[in-house]
Amino acid sequence: MPYIDLSAFPTTQTAFGRWQPLNAPLGVGAFGINAIECDPGEAIDTTHDETDTGQHEAYIVVAGRAEFRIGLDIYDAVPGTVVAAPDPAATRSFRPLEPGTRIICIGAAPTEGAPAFGEWIG
């Protein structure tokens, strides 16, 4: 299915929050894509790095508001904000600042000879 309404798609409660695994439903496998729905005060810890996997990650806030920490940098992100963590060794985390915060998380390890996505835009 190439279309998902996140507000109607079920979440799965984990030790790391309420997640929506999106790869299988969307039929994509070249990168990881999931969404998390979270509220302030939830006991979730998203602090991690990707040293073991080499992944680059990007986060897109689609609802609510969140604070991201990427290395030593802090970002206040509202809907439409994209935050990236291209350095696998950088510690990254986020926390919701408003109820109903929803973040799409995308990650993949770079491959040698990978195309420069977006170059066609100019």
Locate predicted features.
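A short, N-terminal "cap"/entry segment at the start of jelly-roll beta-barrel domains
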Residues: 1-49, 119-122
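Double-stranded beta-helix
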Residues: 3-5, 95-122
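Short acidic-glycine-tyrosine-enriched beta hairpin
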Residues: 71-89
